[in-house]
UniProtKB/Swiss-Prot annotation:
Keyword Nucleotidyltransferase: yes
Family classification: Belongs to the RNase PH family.
Taxonomic source organism: Rhizobium meliloti (strain 1021) (Ensifer meliloti)
Name assigned to this protein: Ribonuclease PH
Record's function text: Phosphorolytic 3'-5' exoribonuclease that plays an important role in tRNA 3'-end maturation. Removes nucleotide residues following the 3'-CCA terminus of tRNAs; can also add nucleotides to the ends of RNA molecules by using nucleoside diphosphates as substrates, but this may not be physiologically important. Probably plays a role in initiation of 16S rRNA degradation (leading to ribosome degradation) during starvation.
Amino acid sequence: MRPSGRKTDQMRKVSFERSFSKHAEGSCLVRFGDTHVLCTASLEEKVPAWLRNGGKGWITAEYGMLPRATGERMRREAATGKQSGRTQEIQRLIGRSLRAVVDLPALGERQISIDCDVIQADGGTRTASITGAWIALHDCLKWMEARNMVKLEKVLKDHVAAISCGIFANQPVIDLDYLEDSAAETDANFVMTGSGGLVEIQGTAEGKPFSEEEFASLMLLAKNGIAELVEMQKQAIAG
């Protein structure tokens, strides 16, 4: 039995609140249960120096957690003077995931900066960030299209979403919350496109190694869960 009472293949309640920020070209407050992340997409009419005059754009991402997003207050990373390895890993993952479904030449020599700020954390912050960031990116590109800057369908080639899966109490389960994640025997994150392409898989055995059969079970859970998330994204942008 999962602590939340959910079935092994049951995700937490997921919601997307678009245009949460009035300033950003695209924004979305995404909720995976009690994990809440504000994702914004900001347009810059420039690219990094190493991309100048290359005829293509760039998507980059930053990730952070508010001090009281967790049970005990954390120091702001800005106050410590450096980002943790975890933060750097997650923001690179978000950027890679979004670039996988973007035609960078079609964007032109522009950069879209994605900011994912965790307001409240209860497990799965990186997967929620990727899934919500896609909505923010979509809405930023839609804003650009309304100003004849790009064609949305030419830049954004597909959906992308992510979900965590793991082995908890000897059972493969989907969308782990903090209690499950902290006690899981195996923890994995899956990033996939709407058409079923794999973008990234991160999997770690916390205790005993997991078998190929167990991995296949996690993969199936993730595939079905991400298909659900993509449908939710479609419904969100249609509204």
